[in-house]
Amino acid sequence: MKNESLLSIWIEAKHIIEPLCEDLPVLTDEPGDWRVETPSGRPFITLRIQKSHVGLYVLPMYYHPHIRPRSMDAYLKGKSTFRFVRTKPLPVEGIQDIIERARAMIGTY
């Protein structure tokens, strides 16, 4: 884990995302690193503590950028990565929305 002080943000984000992915295979489940894949074995999402942020990597969004809710623009870094830091509250509804939209793309990327 690159920064233990971000563990509370990571845990909060995981608690938001995990129920939306409960039927998908979990590849890694360690403190600070959680990876989920599709039933066919493609990467789906990764939630990982980095040096200065908690990153949410949403692979379907890389191929289908139109699924990104505009409410998440302030957190977007790159094509399919969201960064969460201590200074901003987690956008619970935005996270739920992006995971639901990404699930609809399973099998199309």
Residue ranges and their predicted role:
Residues M1-Y109:
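Charge-dense, helix-prone N-terminal extensions
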